[in-house]
Design a protein with these regions (language model features):
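Conserved FAD-binding catalytic core of PHBH/FMO-like flavoproteins
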Residues: 267-274, 278-398
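Juxtamembrane "helix-exit" motif on the non-cytosolic side of transmembrane helices
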Residues: 13-21
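N-terminal Rossmann-fold NAD(P) dinucleotide-binding loop
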Residues: 134-135
Length: 468
């Protein structure tokens, strides 16, 4: 069609030019000059339109006439129409398609193991739970350059009757992690050892903590559990690449047998959201929701601790915890602040219906004289609280993409006071192991970690720390 229009236009112009040429010689000169300059303008316009830029596609010889005509001024006004409109819409669609493809390609590149680019809100590690282990691990891994997101059900200060006595092994681990500042300003109490009261023989045995290489006592420390947790959380929150979310994790997300992230319900908005990462650390504590889906071992509850706080109670020996060998179960006593002392009474079997009566009638008569009066006052005025004394041996977690740690993974009797020591040493171990893996998407590198027989290692360390 364009060729036909070009020929018709050329014939029309030729005839008109013939009429003009028949007028006079002068007119012939003027018209000749006009045609020369007009042709030159067409050529320059054509070269400008199709000759710009290196590597641009040149028009074919078959389309030369149509392209030459289209270069004429106002040609687009005569020959544009629905086709141009459709072409514009198609161009917009192609442009959007290109942007969409480019975005998809960038996402694919960022998510590839070798070229992953993380940001503050694109975590490498998600930690479920912000207790001792979760908070401490978030702080130290963030200092190693990891982007960490912590999801905690309730970020208010917790109120518990256990997790208050940090043994020397745990205190050393806390210092090694650079977190010793978390026990400062808590009105904490230094502990240098134990005094064992044998009520049957009416004797006392002192058991001091071991000495260090400088012949100084390796002390422990006791405090309000909630204050310590808030100190650890503040240390983690101070790191710029740690993000805290207040919400409840409902599911571990899996793909091809590997944990790839979590689904959680945000507390403030009640919205259900998903978050993905290469490594999820489950540290949701004693009553773990996800333990049974990751390990086969079950929790064994041997007894219950009943706790209360005595005010201004004297100590048999300064800075020493006390253990009373009562009948039928022991009583643990340790100072947690400048004027408060925790009492934990171990009760085996079925819990008595009237706890206050049990404490007054069964426990009070067996206590040392210096404790009796403050104990009786505490039982009568303070709220008695209970906590199961649980045992859970460690076992391997045979699922990639997830770690199960803390009380969710391994527990021993609270009488040992070794729970937090084990937790902090586990943080030390995993900090050391993970620092050798710069990219946690490198599954092969991560899978090499179990080659150290991790279950046996944790069991050995747990027993060693408890014995310190």
């Amino acid at each position: 069609m364009w060729t036909f229009l070009g020929i018709a236009t050329f014939t029309y112009v030729y005839k008109k030019c013939d009429d003009l040429l028949s007028v006079s010689y002068a007119n012939k000169e003027v018209l000749g000059a006009f045609l020369v300059f007009f042709s030159l303008g067409l050529i320059l316009s054509y070269r400008y339109r199709y000759g710009q830029g290196k590597g641009k596609k040149q028009p074919s010889n078959m389309g030369f006439i149509s392209q030459l005509i289209s270069a004429l001024p106002l040609a687009s006004s005569f020959f544009s129409g629905p086709t141009d409109s459709n072409g514009t819409e198609q161009g917009k669609a192609n442009q959007y398609k290109k942007r969409k493809v480019s975005f998809s390609e960038s996402v694919q590149t960022e998510n590839s193991p070798s070229n992953r680019i993380t940001s503050q809100f694109d975590p490498e590690i998600i930690i479920v739970g912000s207790g001792v282990l979760g908070s401490a691990m978030a702080a130290v891994l963030a200092r190693d350059g990891r982007n960490v997101t912590v999801i905690e059900r309730d970020l208010k200060e917790p109120d518990r009757i256990v997790g208050e006595l940090l043994q020397p092994g745990g205190y050393r681990a806390l210092k090694a992690l650079g977190l010793e500042g978390t026990v400062e300003g808590l009105d904490a109490h230094i502990v240098n050892g134990y005094v064992i009261h044998d009520m049957e023989s009416k004797t006392e045995v002192e058991i001091p903590y071991p000495l260090d290489e400088n012949s100084q006592v390796q002390c422990g420390t006791a405090f309000h559990h909630g204050r310590f947790i808030m100190g650890l959380r503040n240390a983690a929150m101070a790191e710029p690449n740690v993000r805290f979310i207040e919400g409840t994790v409902t599911h571990l997300l899996e793909e091809d047998g590997k944990v790839t992230g979590v689904q959680y319900k945000e507390k403030e908005s009640a919205e259900t959201k998903e978050l993905y990462c290469p490594l999820t650390v489950v540290a949701d504590g004693h009553f773990s929701k996800f333990r049974k889906s990751l390990v086969k071992n079950k929790v064994n509850v041997s007894s219950h601790f009943v706790g209360c706080i005595m005010k201004d109670s004297p100590q048999f020996k300064p800075n020493h915890a006390e253990l009373v060998l009562a009948n039928p179960s022991p009583v643990l006593i340790y100072q947690i602040s400048s004027n408060e002392t925790r009492v934990l009474v171990d009760i085996r079997g079925e819990m008595p219906r009237h706890l206050k009566n049990y404490m007054i009638e069964k426990i009070y008569p067996q206590l040392p004289e210096h404790i009796k009066e403050p104990f009786l006052l505490a039982v009568q005025t303070d709220r008695l609280r209970t906590m199961p004394a649980s045992f859970l041996p460690p076992s391997p977690v045979n699922k990639p993409g997830v770690l199960l740690l803390g009380d969710a993974y391994n527990m021993r009797h609270p009488l040992t006071g070794g729970g937090m020591s084990v937790v902090l040493n586990d943080v030390r171990i995993w900090k050391s192991l993970l620092c050798n893996i710069p990219d946690l998407h490198d599954n092969q590198a991560v899978l090499k970690i179990p080659c150290i027989n991790f279950g046996k290692l944790v069991f050995t360390i747990s027993n060693w720390v408890d014995s310190v």
